């Protein structure tokens, strides 16, 4: 099935107005939000042990929650953090492993990844992972996500296709990327904001499209 033309955004998006301190604060809030649930579950498991509860159930809860927290922190380190020195490059294989582990921890979405493995600019990897998060949020009941990389070292193109029940283009991502934001950015909307900011920094155009069967998210290098 041929998708309709993707809606795109050009560089220097007028919505990108957050100061550095505000951006850092909101990203920190986002990371804390992502890990507080599994960390809280670990604490619950320890309380069960203290109260003499079923050791097997408590240990299973602790083990599963610790894995979930670890996976989320590793993903956040690549997607939001410095992950090395300023200007460093990152292996796309690390991004693939982080994305697959992230989805596997919740056991509701299958991720396939295709394209050449390469060492590319850090911000491109961060953009790829944040675009993955946008796609992941578009299928809240789970499903499949297909990630395709083309020529990642030069005139890169990233394409992510999401399929699942109750799929929907994330409204805040659409608003921010098309310049139609009506509400202030907060901890719940900072991730799509950061995705658009990364695309701007990388000189890449974002696109999105939808059919009854799938949602498509793209990032392409802007032609000189």
List PLM regions with ranges:
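Conserved signal-transmission helix
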Residues: 2-22
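Conserved short strand/loop->alpha-helix "switch" segment adjacent to the catalytic nucleotide/phosphoryl-transfer site
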Residues: 16-26, 57, 108-136, 140, ...
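Histidine phosphotransfer helical core of two-component systems
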Residues: 20-27, 35-91, 119, 123
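Conserved ATP-binding N-box helix of the HATPase_c
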Residues: 25-54, 123-152, 191-201
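Short beta-to-alpha transition helix within the HATPase_c
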Residues: 85-105
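Glycine-rich/acidic phosphate-handling loop/turn and adjacent ATP-lid/helix
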Residues: 152-192
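Glycine-rich ATP-binding loops of the HATPase_c
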Residues: 203-210
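Glycine-rich nucleotide-binding loop
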Residues: 211-218
């Amino acid at each position: 099935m041929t998708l309709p033309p993707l809606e795109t955004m050009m560089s220097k998006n007028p919505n990108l107005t957050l100061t550095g301190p505000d951006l850092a604060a909101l990203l920190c809030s986002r990371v804390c939000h992502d890990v507080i649930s599994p960390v809280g579950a670990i604490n619950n498991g320890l309380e069960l042990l203290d109260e003499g509860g079923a050791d097997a159930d408590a240990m299973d809860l602790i083990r599963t929650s610790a894995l979930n927290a670890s996976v989320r922190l590793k993903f956040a380190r690549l997607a939001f953090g410095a992950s090395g020195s300023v200007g460093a490059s990152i292996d796309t294989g690390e991004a693939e492993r982080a994305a697959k582990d992230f989805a596997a921890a919740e056991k509701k979405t299958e991720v396939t990844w295709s394209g050449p493995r390469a060492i590319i600019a850090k911000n491109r990897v961060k953009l790829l992972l944040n675009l993955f998060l946008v796609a992941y949020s578009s299928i809240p009941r789970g499903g499949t996500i297909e990630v395709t990389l083309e020529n990642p070292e030069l005139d890169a193109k990233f394409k992510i296709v999401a399929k699942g029940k109750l799929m929907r283009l994330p409204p805040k991502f659409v608003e921010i990327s098309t310049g139609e934001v009506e509400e202030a950015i907060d901890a719940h909307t900072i991730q799509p904001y950061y995705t658009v900011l990364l695309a701007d920094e990388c000189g890449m155009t974002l696109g999105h499209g939808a059919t009854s069967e799938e949602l498509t998210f793209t990032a392409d290098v802007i032609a000189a």
